[in-house]
Amino acid sequence: MLDLLIFGGIVIDGTGRAAYRADIGVQGGKIAAIGDLSSCEAACRIDASGAVVTPGFIDIHRHADAALFRPDFGKAELAQGLTTIVNGNCGLSLAPFGQAHRAEILSYLYPICGAIDPRTATQRLSDYFPSLPPLPLHVGMLVGAGTLRADAAGYALTHLEEAHYHAIHAAMEQALSDGALGVSLGLGYAPECFYTTQELIYALSPLAAQNIPLTVHMRQEGGGVVDSVEEMLTVARALRLPLHISHLKAMGKENWGTKIPQALSLLTRARDEGLDVTCDVYPYTAGSTQLLHILPPDFLEGGIDAVIRRLQDAGARRALRQRIESGVGFDDIARLAGWDGIYLTGLYRPENLPYLGSSIAQVAAQTGKDPLDCCCDLLVSERCEITMIDFMASEEDIARILRSPLSNLISDATYPSEGKPHPRVYGTFPHLLEHFVREKGVLSLEEAVKKMTLLPAQALRLKAKGALAVGLDADINVFDPAQVHETGTYEAPCQLAQGMRYVIVGGTVALHDGVFSEQSAGTILKRGN
């Protein structure tokens, strides 16, 4: 007898092949049979008439490292069909790190990951994994190379000594041994922004020819995005490793329509020469990260205390104004998005809370300040722990990336403890189905499902996931594509998506018509499992 039988639905198996009618049988958390199973007995039967049956969706780029410990974790994810997520992205992982720079690291992670119980930030992934509560969905972890560097040398040093590299190498190897799925880079963030290309290659040398995925938030995603792709291809060639470029985009109207075709062409040529290169994209024209990210890399030298001193110094602020007006050598988000395109979504001091949800331009007008002075004063007041949403990308570029066979879908969901998160936390996967499939026809339903299942699974070597095939994990969604709906907005983002009839995690029903199961069937995914 089967544990579970899903009958009467249209199967979209994740491979991109045309949809077909079939039943699916589940036994022991695995897919046991696909076909006409009308004669089979099952302990539980699910009628999928009028619905499609797909693999569970996989988001390999979230920042839920600390959110996993929140009592309501999983609802936002399951409601949009997610059965697997991966954290530790952009070089920013909650582990591993020790005591020497713990306070600095926790402060730096705060706008991205939210409030962190120091007991959950551990020196080893082998300690972090057992500390996790029961999980409602499967969770994997990348080890953040930025966290490794900060643990070895803090945020103050721009150039490392051999002893620092030795510590980074040892910690990286240990994290991979403990089960990290790969390594993530955040070259747009301190302290990794201080690496030269050759220093970066040396820091990553334990990965050489090991077939371990490297994901990267590139050094620049605006006017320098093509050069940044070139840099990462240099790294991939030098180390002979699989490269996955995170949230590919071209920030700033001046770069729309030109930079992304060039970047995709570079990736396609690299793929043709034999490199294992892929990328991902989120389906929104706005991103979300630390407000600190508007500053040029050299302004970040010395760590947060040094940054605050510079922000308070009139001469340094004048120099910053000149850098932002010129926009040379860094992702000048203030210029690329405009002060009216940068919204404050995570503020924590009571006197600043009235500005929550306002743009920098709006706050500047309310306070009678110049926008840059307003921004700098807020950063000082909040000790740089501010989250923003910045509107800077082109929907046409997003469509170009989605059409590429190299791309998969991600959310880049951040989890600030207060304020208004980006609606992508709650709605990325329904947004793709609703907007880019149903409304705009950028992708077929089969193509979209592949970008949410098999392609992300392949990028991070999740061999038992991403498709409906006998022997693979029974992570399965049942839904009517016409009913899938993203309910959240930028003004009111914290709303669960609608339309998932069933979400099945490891053969266990986790969600049925908006009702969440009390069972926790999620597992911790480790490299090599």
Regions found by a protein language model. Give the residues of each.
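Alpha-helical scaffold segments that flank or form the walls of functional sites
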Residues: 66-142, 161-178, 201-209
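Divalent metal-binding pocket/active-site signature
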Residues: 166, 174-234
